[in-house]
């Protein structure tokens, strides 16, 4: 199989595509099962070898009720890890995933890019680290529910691109009224102590509500940083980064009405 797509159908389980599963000598370039109704893998699943596996828009994982019995939660299925599937790019957009069990990525040894955008994640497990994600260079966590900056992602030693766009959650007031809020507000300190600080080149935190980025905690080693649509942000850019912006070596995504200090060459209202 070079390319295989069965998207936009009504499948409820992921089948065995290869007779020898993950041990097959053949690797598919692309396998797409997106937009089905897949909740589980076939009993006796043997694994898969694919450069790109797309499972987007499937209600994956074991469903269970919370203590209140009102909400159905889903965990990422562990069959891919248990079968030591060989996947370079795994796409799990909009799969209703709430949590990642510790064993989720344990044996995905060649994984290089992971897209978990559009789920309901609030944290990354401590096992999400250099031992299980040693070669991951691209990570998309956009459109989830992180209220605390997922520093666990910065333990990945080869991380090059990280997307954290639009973290939101539903909150309920004392009267039972529900509303959606941007829940990621605090910028972390100590980023420079993490392995990914030296390798990360693109960081996108747009469409959040980050409050303040001090000069000493500014990510100086990235070459593309997007802070647009953070309406309450106050940020100070180091002088060396401003020089890079001026020479075209650093791309900053921002809004003209944001409070950004330290770089008069930017087209900001406060610089006019």
Language-model-detected regions and their locations in the chain:
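Conserved hydrophobic position(s) of the canonical leucine-rich repeat
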Residues: 1, 11, 28, 38, ...
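Hydrophobic anchor residues at the C-terminal helix/turn of individual leucine-rich repeat
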Residues: 17-23, 44-46, 67-69, 80-82, ...
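Consensus "Asn ladder" position of solenoid repeat domains
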Residues: 6-9, 36, 58, 95, ...
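Inter-repeat linker/turn residues at the boundaries of leucine-rich repeats
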Residues: 9, 23-26, 36, 48, ...
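Acidic/polar low-complexity surface segments
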Residues: 17, 21, 57-78, 165-187
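Canonical leucine-rich repeat
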Residues: 14, 41, 63-64, 75-76, ...
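Conserved hydrophobic beta-strand positions in leucine-rich repeat
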Residues: 2-6, 29-33, 51-55, 88-92, ...
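Leucine-rich solenoid repeat scaffolds
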Residues: 223-272
């Amino acid at each position: 199989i070079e390319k295989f797509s069965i998207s936009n159908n009504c499948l409820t389980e992921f089948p065995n595509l290869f007779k020898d599963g993950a041990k097959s000598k053949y690797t598919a370039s692309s396998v797409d099962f997106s937009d089905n109704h897949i909740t589980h893998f076939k009993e006796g699943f043997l694994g898969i070898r694919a450069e790109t596996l797309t499972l987007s828009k499937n209600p994956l994982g074991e469903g269970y009720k919370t203590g209140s019995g009102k909400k159905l939660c889903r965990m990422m299925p562990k069959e891919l890890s248990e079968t030591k599937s060989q996947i370079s790019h795994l796409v799990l957009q909009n799969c209703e995933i709430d949590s990642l069990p510790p064993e989720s990525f344990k044996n995905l040894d060649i994984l290089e890019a992971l897209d978990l955008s559009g789920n309901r994640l609030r944290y990354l497990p401590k096992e999400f680290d250099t031992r299980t994600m040693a070669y991951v260079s691209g990570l998309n966590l956009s459109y989830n529910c992180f209220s605390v900056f997922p520093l666990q992602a910065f333990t990945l030693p080869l991380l090059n691109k990280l997307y954290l766009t639009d973290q939101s959650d539903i909150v309920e007031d004392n009267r039972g009224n529900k509303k959606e809020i941007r829940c990621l507000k605090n910028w972390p300190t100590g980023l420079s102590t993490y392995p990914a600080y030296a390798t990360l080149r693109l960081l996108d935190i747009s469409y959040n509500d980050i409050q303040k980025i001090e000069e000493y905690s500014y990510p100086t080693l990235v070459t593309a940083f997007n802070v647009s649509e953070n309406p309450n942000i106050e940020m100070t850019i180091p002088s060396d980064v401003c020089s890079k912006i001026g020479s075209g070596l650093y791309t900053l995504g921002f809004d003209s009405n944001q409070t950004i200090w330290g770089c008069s060459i930017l087209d900001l209202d406060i610089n006019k």
